[in-house]
Amino acid sequence: MNAVHELARLYGVAATYMDYRAQPREVSVQSQAAILAAIGIDAADEQAAAAAIHQHQTVRWTRLLPPVVVVETGEPLVVPVSVPLDLDATWLEWRISFEGGRQRKGAARLDKLKVVEEGSADDRAYRRLSLTLPELPLGYHTATIALDTGLSGEVRLVVAPARCFEPPAISSGTRVWGVAVQLYALRSQRNWGMGDFRDLRELIREAAPLGCGIVGLNPLHALMPANPAHISPYSPSNRQFLNVLYIAVEDVPDFAECEAARQRVAAADFQEKLQTLREPANVDYVGVAAAKFEILKLLYASFRSRHLEQDTERCQAFRSFVEMQGEALRLHATYDALDAHLRLQGPQYWGWPSWPEDYRDPTAPVVVRFARERAQDVEYFLYLQWLAAEQLREAQASARELGMAVGLYGDVAVGADSAGSETWANRRLYRQGASVGAPPDALALKGQDWGIPPQDPNELRTQQYQPFVGLIRNNMRYVAALRLDHVMSLYRLW
């Protein structure tokens, strides 16, 4: 095996695959080297590949603990511990911090632990020991392990159920039928030119009495408010958040309090505009966005004066939502505000890869300063996400109240747009030098290129799978079931 093949094996880049005719195909060294380059690994020649292998092995042996250990409930919880042979260590102490806040402590003699592997890095010998910890409850926990020499580290412990939850109607074997809809395509005489969350509630109210147990939806992921012509739900800006064009504007509580918004919507020219938006066979996304954002900005101004400045219960509900969503939502709202700001300066700014260099890093001082100086612009997009989340939550609540066996069935796209907020907020995870697709088959003899940057699986593990956890958590928050677009991507990705 040459160095490039060995390096590819270490980083999980396949050497072969089965084509659609069930014939084995080899992946060329050039393709393997290109994929490695996309994840930041130099494999241009044998010498570079050998150096990269050495670096990989050095990190593997010199790190005391892996970043994360995942087990299913009932399985032994075994943590590998890498210890230098020349280190005069006798004991280790461990402390588990449970997800709920309590802690548990223990200790072990190193000479009583099983040696599972031996190796070396930079002329120093190591042994990998197997530390078995007590069985833990479901959840995300943290273990701190310290040797008596002072060397210490942390590992995230993920204890997962053996399978996904099934509602009683499914687990009992009952057959459940439902409908699948593209929400944007729902028509009504009151919406503003595209299906919205009130239309979804109306669909639930009509379908539930007929025995419908599930309503399947297209991905509802956040797109780009400043570029409403970017319409594909399968190329979203951020899969953790929602497309705010689905907000039913007149159902927002602030609409009833905002005289300016009500007068504007009631105006003859605005009503004529809404009727025009409802008429075409295809959704006029640009027109819908213009109408909705015109009124939503008025509602935000009213919300600020009536609630944020008065610290009302509605203000507290908004603040709680923002706090719950945390840094991920703050960065998404910052991106939307920045994107809107820069697009006003010209078409050369079509997404973060085209932004001035300093703005491409979400932690850069210029970005932090922008978020501080344009705080209300950022807060406006936080507000929109809150409105969308509340209306989707109400739709699922309606499904439950009306006795649907399951309720809303959400959809998670396979990836995020290369110029959107999800990739901007975590550039180390997404590899812009490659794109996701599918191998050749009978319908696409040249294969498919979906134009979506893949995640680096090694970086995902380094980040303790937190991006995946956040993705599933946020998408399950307001639905009862979830479809992962291309579930095979949990195992492999073309």
What is each model feature region?
Residues 37-108, 114-146, 159-426, 460-461:
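Acidic/aromatic-lined carbohydrate-recognition and catalytic surfaces
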Residues 22, 101-103, 150:
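Detector for glycine-centered tight turns/loop "hinges" at secondary-structure junctions
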Residues 381-402, 463-494:
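Active-site neighborhood of glycoside hydrolase catalytic domains
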Residues 1-60:
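Long, contiguous interaction/targeting segments characteristic
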Residues 148-154:
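Short acidic/polar inter-strand loop motif in beta-rich domains
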Residues 5, 33, 204, 396, ...:
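Short glycine-/small-residue-rich flexible loop motifs, especially phosphate/cofactor-binding loops
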Residues 405-466, 471-474, 492-494:
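Substrate-binding/active-site clefts of carbohydrate-active enzymes
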